[in-house]
């Protein structure tokens, strides 16, 4: 882990970020840098560099699947949309991404999650339809 120079780790993360977000990558990172949440841009750079772009265990596509699986139960459609598209940008097929989404939805629903009422009350679930590709 520590054999790779920090500059290479950060570049690897930058390259993976660009792969996932494609033509909107600069805009999204700029928004994170300016959003008012201290160090969000730095945190993203470090997470992508040290964790998400490391392909020693998972491929980029498999990493995208893990991210999709983590985002669906959190009800964060804007982030989920980016990672659904990012999985395709990284080499997954639309059918594969839909299959991963479907399995995760089945697991969430089996765990008691559901579409919430319009006022957002009523337990664990989603405030709107879960994003898809």
Regions inferred by a protein language model and the residue ranges of each:
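Acidic, glycine/proline-rich low-complexity segments that act as flexible tails and inter-domain linkers
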Residues: 1-60, 94, 109-133
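A short, ordered amphipathic alpha-helix with a cationic face
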Residues: 37-38, 71-75
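Short, structured motif recognition centered on aromatic/hydrophobic residues
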Residues: 62-72, 104
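Short helix-coil transition sites and intra-membrane helix breaks within transmembrane domains
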Residues: 73-78, 113
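Extended intrinsically disordered, low-complexity coil regions enriched in Ser, Thr, Gly, Ala
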Residues: 76-106
